[in-house]
Regions:
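Flexible coil/turn and secondary-structure edge motifs
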Residues: 1-180
């Protein structure tokens, strides 16, 4: 997530019942966990509205328990928030994105939205995966190519030109950068 104000990201597992799951356990489908991204951001530079814009636009939230060719509950679309005050803006963004999707005949958003129970850091080899050599061929998050416009209580802080670094017309990863 090469967005101004994003301090760090890490991938992990959340939403399930198993304590400290391994990747293989999560892939079994028996843990109940989803593969997730933890985002730490500077609220003075970037708003949760901007992060929600990125979230909705960079994958297909209408797919249930899958992203692209990756199938299973561990690949479900989910937002786990850790501050109850964030719930309203998340729901507002979901409603606005659903309306935008309906205009292009997409189905219902399947994204799970709930308070974060526990986050488990994934194995080191999963961290910053998209920055690793050759990862782009496999990346299967397929964007809908539908953009999230303003929505109730949104407070976008990033300028429009920031979003020019993303190509919403590609079928897989949308970040424009060198990664052979």
């Amino acid at each position: 997530w090469k967005l101004p104000g994003v301090i760090t990201t890490s991938v992990g597992y959340s939403g399930g019942k198993t304590i400290n799951p391994t990747y293989n356990e999560v892939c079994s489908g028996y843990t109940g966990h989803a593969e997730v991204v933890r985002v730490v951001w500077d609220k003075k530079i970037i708003d949760i509205s901007d992060l929600l814009k990125m979230f909705w636009e960079c994958h297909d939230p209408t797919q249930k328990n899958r992203q692209g060719n990756d199938c299973g509950t561990q690949y479900r679309s989910a937002i786990f928030f850790n501050d109850k005050s964030q719930e309203e803006i998340i729901i507002n963004s979901q409603k606005a994105y659903q309306k935008a999707l309906e205009k292009d005949n997409f189905g219902e958003i399947q994204t799970e939205i709930k308070i974060l129970n526990k986050y488990f850091y994934a194995e080191e080899y999963h961290q910053q995966y998209l920055a690793s050599f050759g990862s782009r061929q496999y990346c299967s998050a397929s964007p809908t190519k539908i953009k999230l416009k303003d929505f109730e209580n949104c407070n976008y802080k990033l300028k429009d030109e920031i979003w020019d670094n993303f190509n919403w017309e590609v079928d897989k990863c949308v970040l424009i950068s060198t990664n052979e």
